[in-house]
Amino acid sequence: SLHRPPGCRHCVGQLRLCDLDTADAVEEMGAEHVPCPVDDIVVDEDNKVVTTPAYMLAQNIAEAASGIEKLVARVLVLTA
């Protein structure tokens, strides 16, 4: 199981497109779900967590790639 710090901000997708049960479960664990399109990221600077909906929303690997590339770039910035 994944551990997320209380109050951690992250995404599982846009509200109208994401799995609402997953978004609700995330919030029940004390995290904040931030709606986000497949090609973007959510950054929690305080907890140094970066998320993208990627496979949760993508219709193909090309759609997921944009968000994944942004995520990797931001993780590298956070670790510098």
From Swiss-Prot:
SUPFAM superfamilies (alphabetical): Class I glutamine amidotransferase-like (SSF52317)
Keyword Cell division: no
Assigned keywords, A-Z: Lyase
Catalytic activity: glyoxal + H2O = glycolate + H(+)
Entry's EC annotation: 4.2.1.-
Entry-linked InterPro entries: Class_I_gatase-like (IPR029062)
Enzyme class: lyase
Keyword Zinc-finger: no
GO molecular-function terms, A-Z: lyase activity
Disulfide cysteine pairs (residue numbers): none
Family to which this protein belongs: Belongs to the peptidase C56 family.
Assembly notes: Homodimer.
Role: Displays glyoxalase activity, catalyzing the conversion of glyoxal to glycolate. However, this apparent glyoxalase activity may reflect a deglycase activity, which could be the primary function of this protein like other DJ-1 superfamily members such as PARK7, YajL, YhbO and HchA. Is not able to use methylglyoxal as substrate.
Protein's UniProt name: Putative glyoxalase ElbB
Taxonomic lineage of the native organism: Bacteria, Pseudomonadati, Pseudomonadota, Gammaproteobacteria, Enterobacterales
